[in-house]
Amino acid sequence: MNIEKMTTTLQEAIAEAQKVAVTRQHQEIDIAHLWKIFLQPNHFGRNFYTDAGLDVDAFEREVDNALDEYPSVAGGNVQYGQNLSQNLFHLLQEADSLREEFQDEFLSTEIVLLALMKLKNYRLTKYLMQQGITEKELRKNIEEMRGGDRVTSQNQEEQYKALEKYGVDLVQQVKAGKQDPIIGRDEEIRDVIRILSRKTKNNPVLIGEPGVGKTAIVEGLAQRIVRKDVPENLKDKTIFSLDMGALIAGAKFRGEFEERLKAVLKEVKKSDGKIILFIDEIHNIVGAGKTEGSMDAGNLLKPMLARGELHLIGATTLDEYRQYMEKDKALERRFQKVLVKEPTVEDTISILRGLKERFEIHHGVNIHDNALVAAATLSDRYITDRFLPDKAIDLVDEASATIRVEMNSMPTELDQVTRRLMQLEIEEAALKKESDDASKKRLANLQEELADLREEANSMKMQWETEKEEVNAVSNKRAEIDKAKHELEDAENNYDLERAAVLRHGTIPQLEHELKELEEKNAKDNVKMVQESVTENEIAQVVGRLTGIPVTKLVEGEREKLMKLNETLHKRVIGQDEAVDAVSDAVIRSRAGLQDPNRPLGSFLFLGPTGVGKTELAKALAEDLFDSEDHMVRIDMSEYMEKHAVSRLVGAPPGYVGYEEGGQLTEAVRRNPYTIVLLDEIEKAHPDVFNILLQVLDDGRLTDSKGRVVDFKNTVLIMTSNIGSQLLLEGVTPEGTIPEEVENQVMNILKGHFKPEFLNRIDDTILFTPLSLDNVKGIIGKMTAQLAHRLEQQEIVLEITDEAKTWIAENGYEPAYGARPLKRFITREVETPLAKEIVSGRVMPKTKVTISLLDNQLVFENEPIEEV
């Protein structure tokens, strides 16, 4: 018997049977060893017997019994499983005769299974005949399975029932109730039906952005076929979704993938138009399985597509269609394009309403309608890099999952009581060991408190368990209704009118009445520990978590924080009232939801001399809004002085180094859409930079080098500049105000430097005034407070007299340079001498240092702090 003339599956089975013989210490490989392998899960042999109507588990037990009765041999040099038994040799000879009768080139598994029926006296054959399995019946099954084909390939078993192996029957899935309902998309489904009804080129390809519902359209068509809501020519059709991954996986040798695909196509062709093939991500067939000298999957499909023998629906995204399909013109022209557009917000709300029931049943929660509306509107506005309805469905799913997790977790109140109980029990155990009166008294009080707490914990636990049971009861009732509705659909499709009438007028109304009673009973309980409702607030929290943009309703603490934003900024930025007011007002407008949804939250141009707080205000705002001054996108425009550096903002163009990295501005905002963008020293940048900023200021959007639109609608744009600072320094009044004449002069210089279309798009141009003496004193107070804070860590208290502060202000401040020289002056005159005192040991921990003025010089006096 030539093993080379066997199919791969049979060769592998014999090799595995030898391993069984070795494990069981049997000298020969018998029929039972081989059948042990044939009956393994997912093996061709097991599936073959299952289709013949045999109880395979009982047959497997019979095979095990036969193996147990086989004699095992023990010894030092015994060779196990090296020979075939007389029975197995005889079986393979019978199988070879059958192979010649069937005119096969290779001996396949099903022929060996049939050959067993020839050995009438063998134990397993007798068992099969007792179970009603006959040679005639098995032969008929083989002929049906082969459909007139001969075995010409070593992988023949893989090609039987290829569609079942490598595809999913969508129509069957709908009948089994495994698919969510498809709402809308009627126009696209009609287009698909029309193209499928053509004589030739009857292959639609659905093209659209990821997440717009291309696969859903095919599922919608499957649902219509089940409901018989299609033209006559499609009523008896079935849709198979081809799994390209399963088709390619495990194809080890050249040509194996093509054989599998040919087997699938052969089955489709044999069905005479009854099977519609659906390939998701159809661009994968271009080049799939392509190796040197072999054809790719696309070329195997072309002849059948052209002749109309294959009904194929494809789905792919716009980018991949352009990249793969359009390159292969011959393949592209065999398809008819159906463009799937993103649904509107209104359509998305309808889709969500249709899916609501499925989500409620799956998660066991109650989803409010306002949550669905919020999911559609908020995802459309804030999640800009994905598409409806996918992103809205994700929000509802995520919010429902959050509530479900909370429902299954212990409520906070009960958790607190349980932890307190544990704490007191530990204390009780410790006090029991003490014998003094105070401890006994404390123990008595503690035991009293423990008794009360235990009672409270038990009642809360009972309430929680009851509420959970009530929620689960509602969830189970919803699932029952869903099952009954599915049964009703089945009954109507099969014209079982009596069953349909019982369900429609009896079972379903009864279940709905019971559900209503349960919901009303739940609604009466005012105080609830379990939150089971998904509202718009939960959706808003999910949006905030995904994007970092706060869209939840204002809570009390945040209201106070926003109303005090002005004061907080003033504490850090001293003297610039107009600028602080303008920025804080923009933030308040945005959180109240009143700002223009198509523009940034605010765009400001800060003008003024150096060192008066322009950049500091941006940092202060970042710290107040995001609790960290690093939480802002800071771009120093002095780095963008050359024309070619402009591309760094939006990314290098294709073909240039760094194309994959994206732009510094666009990438930062894409990852963090709610932020402050600070463009420092903007007048230093090349004029072309301002052209890039035009659409940011006007529409709140910017397209990067890869064509992705980055959303700037939730950013505060702050630009700083020193233009006209000399005029501001010279023209400021003693009171610290800027005369109108000086303001006009500065504006004229500004108009000369920036184009009108740039200035026209900025919300507010704010002039920062040079600092007055009072402002400078305030800044000195702030700087010395920071120094005092650093000294506190060394247990040194710092005090500075008003005269000393005035002297520092008069000597350290230069109007032309703003507050920055003050920092250097304080370092030189205060920090350095103080550091020397500490290092020399004259100032020790637990010391108070007072800085005062004497003979126009700062003097340091130190005294020990008395311990209280």
From Swiss-Prot:
Location of the region described as NBD2 in the Swiss-Prot/TrEMBL record: 558-770
Keyword Cytoplasm: yes
Assigned keywords, A-Z: ATP-binding, Chaperone, Coiled coil, Cytoplasm, Nucleotide-binding, Repeat, Stress response
Binding site for ATP 2: 608-615
Domain Clp R: 3-148
Chain positions covered by the region annotation Repeat 1: 6-70
Region (NBD1): 161-342
Region of interest (C-terminal), ranges: 771-868
Coiled-coil spans in chain: 393-526
CDD domains, sorted: AAA, RecA-like_ClpB_Hsp104-like
Localization per Swiss-Prot or TrEMBL: Cytoplasm
UniProt-listed PANTHER family: ATP-DEPENDENT CLP PROTEASE, HEAT SHOCK PROTEIN 104
Record protein name field: Chaperone protein ClpB
This protein's encoding gene: clpB
